[in-house]
C-alpha cells in the first residue's frame, strides 16, 4: 500500500507539472473603457490564480501570465467573449512549474502585476518620440510564409535584395537567431527596445530599397518597429514581420528550420529551443559554448544579462558586458581620482553617462527641481544624465497672505502625504488654516504604495537607471525603495542612491538603528543645527544610520536646505559617482 501511495503521489506531481503553462498575447486596438478592462483582468487573473504581467493602455493590451493550463484556457475563453480581442493570437505553451524562485521573481512570475502604461512596449527613446501609427505596420507573414521566403532566397536570387532584421535585445540574440545563406541578418546589438529607433535611423540605408523580414519573440515589438521603418517613406514599403514571432515559427518547425539556438523568453522558462537543441551562445570570459541564463549574471555597469559558464563563474566576481567593453567602459578602473579624469568625449571611447532618476521634495515638481539643480547638472554633465519626474500625489494650492496669489497655478506634488490629505480643489488657491509646520514631514505617513507603483512604471517606461537621487521628501521616498530593493528585483533595479536632506520615512521606522540597508548610498545634508529649516540635521543623520557600514558615504556641508555644488562638496559627489562608471 505504501509503495502504491508513493506512486500515486508521484503520478499526481507529474500531472500537476504537465498542467502548468504560459500564455502570451497582445492586441493593438482602441480601448473604449480602460477602467473596465483593468477590472476584467483583476477579476479573471485573481480568480484563476494567474501570475505574471498585464500591461494596458488606451491603445491595447500586452499580457504574459502563467498558471494551470485549464485556468489559462478559461482566461482565453473569457477574453474571446469580448469583441475587443477579436483576431488576437493567444500563444499558449505547456511547461514545467517555476523551479528557480530567483528567476521566477526576476521575471515577475511570483505575483500578478496589472498596470496602465503609456506604451505597451517602450519604443520611445528619451527625449520622447511620437510613436508611429500602428496601422502602418509591416505585413504579417505566417511562419510557413516566412520560411518559404528564406527557402526561396537560398535557392535563387530575388529581384530585390532580402535582409533579416532582429528586433530583439543583444542578450536575446546571443543565444538564438535566424540564419540563412545568401541573406544578410542585421543584429542591432541593443540593450533595450527603446534603443531600436536610433539604430534604425543610423542604419536606414542598409534597409532602403530591400525586402526587410523582421522578427522578435512573439510579434509585438515588430508591430511598432516595422511601422517606424515604413514611416520613412519611399524605399521602405517592403517591410514584413513574422506573425506570432519566433514562438509560432518553432511550433511550425519543431526542428528549428532557419532558426538556430534558443528563443529567449521573459518568463521562468528563460529560453525555449528546437528539438535540435543547438547552442550558439558563448561564455563571456572563455568563449566556450554556453547559453544558460539561469545563474542571472549581469554586467556590473549596465546591468544587462551576461553568459558566464559554470567553470568561469565565481561568487562575487564582476562582469563587464561586450557593449560596455566596446565603448571603453570596461577599461575604467574601479577606483578613480575625480579631480584627474580623462576626457569623456573621445569618439568611440566615450563612456555611457550614468542615468539618475531624480525625485523632488514635498510641494515641488519636476520642473522646479530641475531648475534648482541646474548648477549640479552642469557640473555633472560629463558623468550623469539627470531625469526628473513629478510625484503622483497632486497637492492643493495653499497661501497664507490676505489675498490669493495672482497668475497661473503651477501644480505641486508629493511622494508621501498626511492622513488628512485632500485632493486639489477645482477653484484653485486655498487659504491655509494654520502656519506651516516645519515638522510636517513627520506626519506624512500615507501614499507610499501609490508612489511605489508609480516608480515601477517610471522605471519600466523611462529606464533603465543606474541610480536614484532624492531631495528632502524625495530622499525619504528613495530610501524607502532602497529598503525594499531585494523585493523589487526586475521592477526597480538600480545600483546606488544619493539622498539629500533626507529623513526616515515611515516604511523604514521599524528598521531604525539596525543598519540593514545594503545599497551604496551618498548622504548630503547640513552639519550645523538650525541652518536647514525644513529637515533637522539629526533626521538626515539618522537616515544615514539605516545603511550598512561600508555602504554609506556622508557629505556634510555648511548650508541650508540645498544641494551644494561648490568645492569640496562637488568633488566628493563626483568621487562617489565615479565608482559606478
UniProtKB/Swiss-Prot annotation:
Record InterPro entries: AB_hydrolase_fold, FSH-like_dom, Rhodanese-like_dom, Rhodanese-like_dom_sf, Rhodanese_C, TrhO, TRHO_N
Official protein name in the record: Rhodanese-like domain-containing protein 6
Catalytic residues (UniProt): 216 (cysteine persulfide intermediate)
Gene symbol of the encoding locus: STR6
Native source organism of the sequence: Arabidopsis thaliana (Mouse-ear cress)
CDD domains in the cross-refs: RHOD_YceA (cd01518)
Membrane-crossing residue ranges in chain numbering: none
PANTHER family: THIOSULFATE SULFURTRANSFERASE/RHODANESE-LIKE DOMAIN-CONTAINING PROTEIN 2 (PTHR43268), THIOSULFATE SULFURTRANSFERASE_RHODANESE-LIKE DOMAIN-CONTAINING PROTEIN 2 (PTHR43268:SF6)
Signal peptide limits: none
All copies of domain Rhodanese, residue ranges: 158-258
